[in-house]
Amino acid sequence: MSENFAAFAYLVSGVMFIMALRGLSHPTTSRQGNTYGMVGMAIAIVTTLLLAKPSASGLAMIVAGLAIGGGAGAYIARKIAMTSMPQLVAGFHSLVGLAAVLVAAAALYAPHAFGIGEVGEIHAQALIEMSLGVAIGAITFTGSIIAFLKLDGRMSGKPIMLPMRHVINAALLIGIVVLIGVLVASESYTVFWLIVALSLALGVLLIVPIGGADMPVVVSMLNSYSGWAAAGIGFTLGNLALIITGALVGSSGAILSYIMCKGMNRSFISVILGGFGGETAAAGSDDIDRSVKLGSADDAAFLMSNASKVIIVPGYGMAVAQAQHAVRELADKLKEQGVEVKYAIHPVAGRMPGHMNVLLAEANVPYDEVFELEDINSEFAQADVAYVIGANDVTNPSARDDKSSPIYGMPILDVDKARTCLFVKRSLGSGYAGIDNTLFYKDSTMMLLGDAKKMTDDIVKAMEN
């Protein structure tokens, strides 16, 4: 295959990836977007193989790698629970970062295979590209592993605040920059692995102090990092498709991070600096009655059956209990009785961007019933019932009313303005941000303590009876 034709094929592949992003931007076109992405990737892989012209043994290794990776991917796709999707995304990001490190190492030890010079005579531009790629890749690798452990509950979701962490991070960053300069001048293997070691440490230290409330931003941020790492691999390999794809992923992840930060009324820098989610004080505890109104499934069934409009607000509690199908059944039962039902989604609900949308799509909830915060917030005042399922921090009135609250200014869903708020939660404990929710103590709120799926199922049964 000629290089000109390969460049054209890579361009077509890049266009397919752009169309994939376009398709994935809306639930109704998401399947089409996935198809575009798969076609684009197939074109890129076939073009690369035809351009490389591997030997028989090399081709056998490539096929074996594709079989192992494809088999593992197919197995994961079939077995993974939708509730574990944030962990899966973080895991995939770590693999991209690791790939960047390994490709950079291969290029350093065998530069002739990459067309970037000979050992001891690698082009300076290639060394700079290689260094940046390995630094970003290593940071992405360990940062994504920490995010995975936090999301999977294997590490505390609370911020781990190390003393002088900002000084340490700054020192590591300066050290990486200095070592990159040394590597370009010396091509030292030792310096290369020092860059890897410092970058791995920086990846851990950047994510460890970030609390669970900021996890959606962290996931999108790591998504951006993985994209730039892939672009770095593309420059090292001289692969146009990887450069295009990496730039697309990197820029889209950065934009998504900005949107997430805007949805939390926080700056991107404040998220990176970490620490949010460590507060344990009960916001507004001095001027509210601490008593709560407890209810049962029968109470909730009566209130919703006699309502004319119900807004369902899913949160991480729905994901943990895998209650999305039960919620869909409840909505169908309400609609049979002539009740208007809508779903309200907060942009940072759950543990990754679009987490709730994915779960509702799995339960085949009609897309025209799902609304974002800015589109539905004004309707809570006209709703008879707001049915909240574990959406804790994103419904906390302290963010709107209490200037002393750590989450003050974060846009929330105004569920407290509904005539009645039914809040399903396992306990009265604070949310992932570590802040008490003043919504629990309002006269219009009825707490339904228990597992979200069982409670919703019990409400459906009570309505049938």
Please provide the spans of the model-predicted regions.
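C-terminal ends of transmembrane helices
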Residues: 16-29, 70-89, 144-159, 202-215, ...
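Mobile "lid/hinge" segments at catalytic clefts and subdomain interfaces of large enzymes
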Residues: 211, 225-269
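Structural signature of hydrophobic alpha-helical transmembrane segments
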Residues: 1-14, 51-71, 126-141, 187-198
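Transmembrane alpha-helix boundary signature
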Residues: 48-63, 75-84, 101-119, 186
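Membrane-interfacial segments at transmembrane helix termini in multi-pass membrane proteins
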Residues: 248-307
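Structured cytosolic domains appended to multi-pass membrane proteins
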Residues: 288-465
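Cytoplasmic-side transmembrane-helix entry/capping segments in multi-pass membrane proteins
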Residues: 31-40, 62-64, 84-96, 159-170, ...
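Transmembrane helix-loop junctions at the membrane interface of multipass transporters and ion channels
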Residues: 53, 106-120, 185-190, 217, ...
